[in-house]
């Protein structure tokens, strides 16, 4: 069963998406089956790190609005890793991007979306792609979508900048995660990620 890893920050500009992309790429290069879902629907951008078009299609938005299945919105970006590193047998990386179209972003801001459908889609994606790891690149701050991501996660990584506002906001995030009973298996997962040289700065709960 896939381990669900949410990478979150209280504010934007912390390097959250870059961290998500790099950790996922290292795991895939090591032979794991990995996927990233960009749930930062209001300000998407992780697709740029993988050299995708400015307007990748289909997207997570298309799935949430019932236009395509979640598997159809998952783009295989393994070849992007192969350009800079050797990928072990079996390794693969898929990305489900969010739409960068202004109209789609405006629709999300205006109408929102069904968070239950997102939850179902994540589970379906993990099953159909036979994933080892599923990364959720969250929207900064605290909202309904972020709380869902935290709730279904096996691991929560919170990235922050060394300033007072981030420290305070991150403390709130960690407290909420504990109240939502994020599985208390962080030591096991931390050791696993450390053994792969993947943890540099993170807060686990």
Label every PLM stretch briefly.
Residues 12, 46, 63, 96, ...:
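Residue-level signature of catalytic and energy-coupling elements of molecular machines
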Residues 25-29, 48, 151, 175:
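Short, well-ordered alpha-helices that flank and scaffold nucleotide-derived cofactor binding pockets
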Residues 33-34, 42-95:
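Phosphate-binding loop that captures ATP/GTP phosphates
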Residues 2-42:
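Walker A/P-loop phosphate-binding motif and the immediately C-terminal alpha-helix
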Residues 71-72, 80, 88-139:
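Cytosolic-facing regulatory segments adjacent to core modules
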Residues 42, 101, 165:
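Conserved Rossmann-like nucleotide-cofactor binding loop
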Residues 46-47, 106, 147:
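A short local structural element in Rossmann-fold oxidoreductases
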Residues 116-191, 195-196, 200:
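Conserved catalytic-core segment of NTP-binding enzymes
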